[in-house]
Amino acid sequence: MDTFLFTSESVNEGHPDKLCDQVSDAILDACLKQDPESKVACESCTKTNMVMVFGEITTKAQVNYEKIVRDTCRGIGFTSPDVGLDADHCKVLVNIEQQSPDIAQGVHGHLTKKPEEIGAGDQGHMFGYATDETPELMPLTHVLATKLGAKLTEVRKNSTCPWLRPDGKTQVTVEYRNEGGAMVPIRVHTVLISTQHDETVTNDQIANDLKKHVIKPVVPAQYLDDNTIFHLNPSGRFVIGGPHGDAGLTGRKIIIDTYGGWGAHGGGAFSGKDPTKVDRSGAYIVRQAAKSVVASGLARRCLVQVSYAIGVAEPLSVFVDTYKTGKIADKDILALIKENFDFRPGMIAINLDLKRGGNLRYQKTAAYGHFGRDDPDFTWETVKILKPKA
C-alpha cells in the first residue's frame, strides 16, 4: 500500500503573532458592535513591553483602543514580564487613520451603494477547502494540531499544568493513503509540542504532563501506535516566550488560520478586516461552498476558488476541483455552487451575518482556526445541501 506523510502546525493564543491577530479582531468586534457599517483595516505588532495598533478605521463607534489591547493581552494570560508581556504596564501605541476616500468611493460609494452593488475592497483570490476525513470536514493534521494548541491553553488556564506559560506551538504528521483522490488517515506518525514553561519544571515532568493532559485527550487512540514519535519541547528549554521571545504581527499565521497547508491559499490574512475585505469574506463563503459540496455527498474532497477586482461586485471567476472524487462532473458542481451561493461582497456580509460584532465574535476566530469550528457564530460553517438536477 502506497502511503505518504503530511504535516500541519498550529500555535496557541499566547504566540506573539496570534496575540496580534486577537488584538486586531477585538478592535473589529468593538467597532462593529456599535456601528455595523464600520470599515476596519487594523494591524497590530508587538515586542517586549509594547503593543502597537495601526491602520485605517472609519466608524461611528467610540472605541478605547488602549483598553481593548490591555484587556486582550490580560485575557490571554500576559500579566507579568516573566511570561513575556505585562498587560497593565506595557506601552500601547495607537496610529489609526480614516479609510482612504479613494477606496471608500470605489467600494461602497461612501456608504451610498446598495448591498448588491458593494464592490470588493481589494483585488485577490481566495480558496475554500473541505475533506471527508474528519467530522469537521477538515484535514486531520490541521484538526489535531489545532486541538492540541487549544488543550495546552485549557490546562494552563484551569491550572491542571500550573507550570505552563501562554506561548506554545504544536505540529502533527499523519500517514495517509490516497483513495482515488480522497485522503484516508492511517496513523499519527509524529506529534511535536513546544510550550513555554516556568523556571522550575523539569523536562521529564513537561513530557509526562503533555502526554497525559494534552495528547491523550486530543489524539484518538486509534491513530497512535508503538511507532508514533513524540517530540516534546525538543529544544530543551522554553522559558522566555511571548513578545519577549519573538516579535509578533497580525496576519503571519494564515495557514494555521485555514487548512494547515492543504488545499490552497491566496495569501490574504483575515484578522482586523471588516466584511468588505474579500480576503476574509471571500474565504468564508468559499469554505461554506466547499463544505456544502462534501457534506451533500457530491465529492469526498473539494477546493473552491473565487477572485475579485477592487470596486467590482461580481466575482471575476469561480473555480472548483474535486480531485477526481466527484459523484458528478466538476462543471456541474460549479453550476450548483453558482446557483446556491452569492459571491458579491455585500451579499456575503448579509447572508453570513458578518456585520455583527461584539461578544468575541471575531476575536474567537483569531486563535485555533477560522474553519471546522462548532460554534453558531461561525456562520460560514453552516451547510447548504446541494442537490443535482435530475
Curated annotation (Swiss-Prot):
Cofactors that this protein relies on: Mn(2+); Mg(2+); Co(2+); K(+)
GO MF term set: ATP binding; metal ion binding; methionine adenosyltransferase activity
Top-level division of the source organism's lineage: Eukaryota
GO biological process: one-carbon metabolic process; S-adenosylmethionine biosynthetic process
Cited InterPro entries: ADOMET_SYNTHASE_CS, S-AdoMet_synt_C, S-AdoMet_synt_central, S-AdoMet_synt_N, S-AdoMet_synthetase, S-AdoMet_synthetase_sfam
Subcellular location: Cytoplasm
Residues that, per the record, bind L-methionine: 56, 99, 246, 277
One cellular component (GO) term of this entry: cytoplasm
Pfam families noted in UniProt: S-AdoMet_synt_C, S-AdoMet_synt_M, S-AdoMet_synt_N
Binding site for K(+): 43
Cofactor stoichiometry and binding remark: Binds 2 divalent ions per subunit. The metal ions interact primarily with the substrate. Can utilize magnesium, manganese or cobalt (in vitro).
Alphabetized UniProt keyword annotations: ATP-binding, Cobalt, Cytoplasm, Magnesium, Metal-binding, Nucleotide-binding, One-carbon metabolism, Potassium, Transferase
E.C. code: 2.5.1.6
Annotated residues for binding of Mg(2+): 9
Signal peptide start and end residues: none
Catalysed conversion reaction: L-methionine + ATP + H2O = S-adenosyl-L-methionine + phosphate + diphosphate
Biological pathway: Amino-acid biosynthesis; S-adenosyl-L-methionine biosynthesis; S-adenosyl-L-methionine from L-methionine: step 1/1
Broad enzyme group: transferase
Binding-site list for ATP: 15, 167-169, 235-238, 246, 252-253, 269, 273, 277
Major site of localization recorded for this protein: cytoplasm
Family to which this protein belongs: Belongs to the AdoMet synthase family.
Subunit structure: Homotetramer.
PANTHER family for this protein: S-ADENOSYLMETHIONINE SYNTHETASE
Known function: Catalyzes the formation of S-adenosylmethionine from methionine and ATP. The reaction comprises two steps that are both catalyzed by the same enzyme: formation of S-adenosylmethionine (AdoMet) and triphosphate, and subsequent hydrolysis of the triphosphate.
Name assigned to this protein: S-adenosylmethionine synthase 1
Source organism per UniProt: Actinidia chinensis var. chinensis (Chinese soft-hair kiwi)
Lineage of the species this protein comes from: Eukaryota, Viridiplantae, Streptophyta, Embryophyta, Tracheophyta
